[in-house]
Amino acid sequence: MRWVLAGLTALLLWLQGLLWFGEGGLNDVRGLSRSVEAQREEVDRLRQRNQALEAEVNDLKTGLEALEERARSELGMIREGETFYQIIEREDDAR
């Protein structure tokens, strides 16, 4: 009976050792959990970056007309072949 109990105790200790320190044991699981969490944070950061880049691309695609209008009105830019006429009012007419 003692030998059986000693054998079962040894088996239990061996299995506990495998559970804690063996391949696929709790130490590996903890390390993998940390790695997974780091990867999730990286994915979240990259998703936010992708969203910002996508918004910038959409602005550039759809915002060209607005950009052109702003360049025309604020900077006085014209297209090639166009003629720019600026009407200057006299100070007497402005009053």
Swiss-Prot record:
Residue ranges of coiled coil: 26-76
Pfam families (UniProt xref): DivIC
Cellular component annotations (GO), alphabetically ordered: cell division site; cell septum; plasma membrane
Subcellular location: Cell inner membrane
Keyword Glycoprotein in annotation: no
Main location (coarse class): membrane
GO biological process assignments: FtsZ-dependent cytokinesis
Keywords on record: Cell cycle, Cell division, Cell inner membrane, Cell membrane, Coiled coil, Membrane, Transmembrane, Transmembrane helix
Keyword Metal-binding carried by entry: no
Chain ranges on the Periplasmic side, renumbered to this chain: 22-95
Topology in the lipid bilayer: Single-pass type II membrane protein
Family, per entry: Belongs to the FtsB family.
Job of this protein: Essential cell division protein. May link together the upstream cell division proteins, which are predominantly cytoplasmic, with the downstream cell division proteins, which are predominantly periplasmic.
Complex formation: Part of a complex composed of FtsB, FtsL and FtsQ.
Official protein name in the record: Cell division protein FtsB
Species per Swiss-Prot/TrEMBL record: Alkalilimnicola ehrlichii (strain ATCC BAA-1101 / DSM 17681 / MLHE-1)
Organism taxonomic ancestry: Bacteria, Pseudomonadati, Pseudomonadota, Gammaproteobacteria, Chromatiales
